[in-house]
Amino acid sequence: MNILRYLPGDRKCSPYLNATNHIVNWTQADNKYSKMNDLMEIEKKLKSLRKQKVEVSIRNKKAIIAEEKKNSERRVYSMADDGEDKARSNKSEPEDPIKLANYSIREYEKWEAKTQNSRHNKSVMGDFQTIAKNSYKKEVDALPKDISHPLKGGITEDGKVQVEDNPELVEKMVNDLNERSKKRYMVRKQKLDKQNKINLDDGFINDKNKRFNAKLNSEFK
């Protein structure tokens, strides 16, 4: 009978050492798999937190928009019927907060992109609004302070004040609007006439036509 003997230094032929190596490899594989599972769990938690953050941001922005819309509504009292005024007031009511929160992330991203693109336009519109406000104040200050005619009107059951319009003031407002429209038309007409004016010395309709002809001449030279 041949008896296999393994020397302590013969690591390549030792079955005990091979078994130990297999166990070590299995342990390392298990540790690696466990780490991968941990990383996947962390990634899932991060995605969930990002989604919750976007949803909370959506709810906050929609609530802010609803509050700003509610505060910016102006109530105008006129000679309109009560039914029309009530319909107008119903339109000015803020939307349901629950309805505002039920927006998808895609809609929120579109709204965010649209808001960023319109920031420059808002700043420009702010300047126009300031000019319009100053013009309106100037026109109001120019109105005659005539109180010789008694005001006609009354108070409705809802507490609204109704005042009849003064025919003279209405006529003056119409004349002012017509005069302003006429001035705008004349300014626009002068600009168009200047653009379409024919320069007899050069033989060009306008600067754009002159540049186009110069470009053609340079191409054929």
Curated annotation (Swiss-Prot):
Intracellular or extracellular location(s): Nucleus
Record key words, sorted: Coiled coil, mRNA processing, mRNA splicing, Nucleus, Spliceosome
Any matching Pfam family: SYF2
Record-level GO cellular component terms: spliceosomal complex
Residue ranges, compositional bias (Basic and acidic residues): 85-98
Domain of life of the organism encoding this protein: Eukaryota
Region (Disordered): 72-98
UniProt feature coiled coil, ranges: 34-63
Chief site of localization: nucleus
One GO-annotated biological process of the protein: mRNA processing
Role this protein plays: Involved in pre-mRNA splicing.
Family statement: Belongs to the SYF2 family.
Subunit structure: Associated with the spliceosome.
Entry protein name: Pre-mRNA-splicing factor SYF2
Organism from which the protein derives: Kluyveromyces lactis (strain ATCC 8585 / CBS 2359 / DSM 70799 / NBRC 1267 / NRRL Y-1140 / WM37)
Biological classification of the source: Eukaryota, Fungi, Dikarya, Ascomycota, Saccharomycotina
Gene label: SYF2
